[in-house]
């Protein structure tokens, strides 16, 4: 069948527009993509723990007015730049959180000083988290609610999303920690980063306790420009970005879709054809429902949604 040159040019133009974002290894899924990230996004070097903390406090996470904020509970200090950053922060109640706990694989180098999973936190909140897995804790189960420089032991009457939460059940192994809402996606992507890059050092079983929760948090709280800037700033020291920050589609493509999946293959017959387009179009016009995995399979421009631009790209793939 012949197609007009004008039609093909239009498709190519739309295809180029769709990939304006940073998409890592388009068309790959599952273990193949996981291994690629692991092999290509290692830090070329780290600063060592003391230097990493100093840089993080005084440069990476420092806000206007020399404000340094603990990510879990929102507690802020004014950092005195004439002093040693780590000492001055510590004296004011801020220390360094290893999002992946030191006792479970981050206790030696380069994991210990890799800034992609390090954050400033209020000291007592950091201690409360300990090496707990992350979770959405039912409000009735929360034992302590942390905000700014205080905690309460009853459900807050207002600003509930600004509190970090800790559950202390009788069995210590069941303890869980929940960051405040605005930190959840950042925490999830720090965890994805560590588990991918340092898979062989990560304690067995710890990841599985929270993988589904972290996937939810990632999609609930996608990277904003501040998080992207943070990743870029860290890359200027370590030589690597957090790939899950610069390409949010990776989480779904690696952890929800199996390797070997063909982009747009909605009916699982290992080919992309008109039948697959019918399924996708039916969803777009509201005639059918799809689970999120299926949406990601046909998300041809990797914007975490299924719309008409994806159809245009998939049609172009069929015509080629």
Label every PLM stretch briefly.
Residues 1-9:
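Bacterial N-terminal signal peptides that target proteins for export
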Residues 75-93:
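Short, His- and charge-rich active-site/binding loops that engage polyanionic ligands
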Residues 9-18:
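Bacterial N-terminal signal peptides
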Residues 21-77, 254:
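N-terminal module-boundary/linker segments of secreted carbohydrate-active enzymes
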Residues 19-24, 252-265, 320:
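Low-complexity, Pro/Thr/Ser/Gly/Ala-rich linker/spacer regions in secreted
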Residues 41, 45, 60, 75, ...:
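Sec/Tat-exported extracytoplasmic proteins
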Residues 259-320:
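Cellulosome-associated attachment modules in secreted, modular CAZymes
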Residues 87-95, 99-259:
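Domain-level detector of nuclease and nuclease-like folds
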